[in-house]
Amino acid sequence: MALLVVLVAVIGPVVSPHSPNALVTLTFAKPSSQFPLGGDFLGRDVLSRVLNGGWLLLLMAAAATAIGIVVGAAAGISAAYLRGARDGIIMRTVDVILAFPQLVFALLLLSLLGPKLWLIVLAVGLSHAPAVARVIRSATLDIAERDYVKVAELQGMRPAKVMAKEILPNLVTPLMVEAGLRLTYSIVIIAGLAFLGFGQPPPAANWGTMINENRIGLQLNPWAVIAPAVLIALLTIGTNTFTDAVARVTIGVDRRPEEAALLDDLGPEQA
């Protein structure tokens, strides 16, 4: 399901029957053989805009997820392994950021720095980092007590090398789960920001923007709103389902017993 939506987003611009910005039909025109999803509020082909409106959303969501995972994992591993004052500083910072809902935190950064696309990606990515850091810290606290970590320390391995070579490889499972969850959240948040006007400037096609632009004509041509909304829903649900399936298969088949126990310790809400 999610793969089908991804396929639509990737090859959509190639197979689009019209330019996404061309005025080719009537305002909120009903679906027809020539325009299967009708027209939007300016008379542009809804199908063409749907086909062109997903690729940048996916790219931005993937980039934001990568930022959140990298920053969050680095913070979580450092806090758990180094402990002491550094652990306190990192986790108190995490607690402060987590006091704000993700969308509010992203909006705060964008209102201060401006709604540029790279800033949207950065803001959403940083909003993911605290939750990732908390999960990875919990997992690292357990791994840091394992024998192979203690052996590396006795051999004189530097802390940075211990974290990179001994701890990080054993966090693959929780990182995979977090990446899937954060990708789902990234899609929803970025689409929501586009709906609120923080996205590609008009007349660029974007699924979130399309919902906002065409909601005034919902009774005239509901497909102008339904089509992008359904694609966003299918993508998020499919991504979440796929992540859950991968986590269960990975824990049950390929991972060592200690990794399975580690993810179980994280709780059902993280698995």
Each model region followed by its residue ranges:
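N-terminal signal-anchor/first transmembrane alpha helix
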Residues: 1-21, 93, 171
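Generic hydrophobic transmembrane alpha-helix motif, especially the helices
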Residues: 36, 40, 70, 80-81, ...
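Short helix-to-coil transition segments within interhelical loops
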Residues: 39-44, 81-82, 141, 151-170, ...
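Transmembrane alpha-helix signature in integral membrane proteins
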Residues: 46-81, 235
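Transmembrane alpha-helices
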Residues: 55-71, 160-192, 239
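Glycine-rich helix-loop "coupling/hinge" segments at transmembrane-helix boundaries
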Residues: 98, 109-112, 139-140, 189-231
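Non-cytoplasmic
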Residues: 104-108, 116-121, 125, 129, ...
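C-terminal transmembrane helix and the adjacent membrane-cytosol boundary/short C-terminal tail
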Residues: 127, 173-181, 222-271
